A protein has these predicted regions:
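PP2C/PPM-type serine/threonine phosphatase catalytic domain
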Residues: 1-272
Length: 272
């Protein structure tokens, strides 16, 4: 199995970069523990890992006594048994390109992207605003896809809104398909930064190209089947695992949400 994750901390709330790092560490820790060397159920892993990351962000906010919670978007993909599955929450995207054409991409959790009429009172508010993310005081909404069978040369790209907010889907698909992934990624990032200029947002990109087993003999990498629970086979900087994935059921998540809401209520009462 292979895990690819991208999280983009949200502005307008405290410590978005911390929320993103917590999400990356939590999902990476869970993957290491459960992929031995493959996951038993990829979709179940993705949904439970996303909720676990959400819970850990809420726990962090509670322990710090924060009145507003750190928040982040998330997109994660697992490649296993010749197929890809993915999950996302917010507006970090996954693109899949096959034969030079855009096969599919995720849909942002914004009113504009989903083409939903905004609720009453939202007419003057930017419809690009997200209605869900990890770390908010409400349980996150997410979409999952897969498994999608992979073919020779398929390319998958995960990115923050700093890329797609500047470059069109067509531009992204074209550049990703016309050169090697190792060249396409820095070129895409540079193009987005150059086009956005001083108004550029954070541009983060992760990409891969699928090679069928009969055309690719892997000589690198580490299998999770042969490492202990306190060692990471990951490029993600990881913190301690102890206690990281305890109490990650729905009841624990609801308790954390209730604690955050109660803190907000008490703060509002004091100000009144």
């Amino acid at each position: 199995s292979g895990l690819f994750v991208l999280a983009d901390g949200m502005g307008g709330h405290p410590e978005g970069e911390v929320a993103a790092q917590i999400a990356l560490q939590t999902i990476s820790a869970l993957f290491q523990r459960q992929a031995k060397p493959q996951l038993e159920n990829v979709q179940e892993f993705l949904s439970s890992a996303l909720l676990a990351a959400h819970h850990q962000i809420l726990r962090y906010a509670t322990e710090k006594g924060m009145l507003d919670t750190p928040r982040t978007t998330l997109v994660a993909a697992v490649v296993q048994a010749g197929a890809a599955s993915w999950i996302h929450c917010g507006d970090s995207r996954l693109y899949m390109v096959r034969g030079g054409e855009l096969l599919t991409r995720t849909r942002d959790h914004s009113y504009l992207e989903l083409r939903n009429a905004p609720p009453p009172g939202l007419d003057r508010i930017n419809r690009n605003v997200l209605f869900t993310c990890l770390g908010s005081p409400t349980k996150p909404i997410y979409d999952s896809t897969g498994p999608v069978h992979l073919e020779q040369g398929d390319r998958i790209l995960l990115c923050s809104d700093g890329l797609w907010g500047t470059l069109s889907d067509e531009d992204i698909a074209t550049q990703l398909s016309q050169q090697t992934v190792s060249n396409a990624v820095p070129d895409l990032v540079e193009a987005a930064l150059r086009k956005a200029g001083e108004s550029s947002d954070n541009v983060t990109v992760v990409a891969l190209e699928w090679e069928t087993p009969d055309t690719f003999d892997s000589t690198q990498g580490v299998s999770t089947d042969s490492i202990s629970d306190d060692v990471f086979a990951s490029t993600i900087q990881a913190g301690p695992l102890d206690g990281l994935v305890d109490d990650l059921d729905d009841a624990a998540i609801e308790r954390s949400i209730a604690e955050i809401n109660e803190a907000i209520r008490r703060s509002a009462a004091r100000k009144a």
